[in-house]
C-alpha cells in the first residue's frame, strides 16, 4: 500500500532472488510460505504449536514468539468454505463469488459464515468457486513471485470459469489485504497469457463494504451500539476505501 507499490514489488522480488539471507531466516521464510497460504497446514501448525508451548522457553526467540502467538482455541472448519452455491433469500439481485481465502479460514471461520448470511439476506446468490483459495498476497509480499502467481492463477481460472458459466456480478472479498492484491492482479500478470483474465478479475473484485453500500444495508434493530473501528491501511490506502465502513456502521 506504499505510494510506489509496483517499485516495491520489484524490489521485493529482486531482494529475494539476489540477497542471501542468514540460513535461519531462509528456513523460516520458506516454512511460512509453505504453511500460511494453506488453511489445513496452518491449522495443523497451530495445533502443534499449542502442544509444544510448555517447551517454548527452551526455543530460539523467533520460534518462541510464534509459538506464543498460537491461539488457545482453534475453530472447527466451516462447511461453508467448501465449493458450493448458496441461494439468495428472496429475489436474486446479484450473483457473486466469495473469496474464502486461506489463513482466515483457519483463524476465524465466523467471518466467511457471517458474510455469506449477510449477502444472502440482501438478495445475493453466493458462489464458493471450485479451485479458488489463497490470493497470493503472503508469498507476493515475500518476493516469492512464482509461488504467488500459482495461487493467483488458480483464483483467476476458478472465477473466470464461473463468469463464463452462470456469470458473476462481483467477487466479494472480506479481507482488505487480499482485496488489494486481487484488484492488482492485472499488474501482477502484465505480459502473461493470463493478463486479460487477470484484469477482468481485478475489475470484478469488490470489498464487502462496497457491495453493501451498493445493495443498501438493511438492519433489523436501531438500538445504539458503541464500537471501535480500525481503518486498515490496505483498505484506505491500497483500495482507497475510506468512508464506506464508517457509513455502514452509522
PLM features: residue spans?
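Iron-sulfur cluster-binding electron-transfer modules in prokaryotic oxidoreductases
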Residues: 6-250
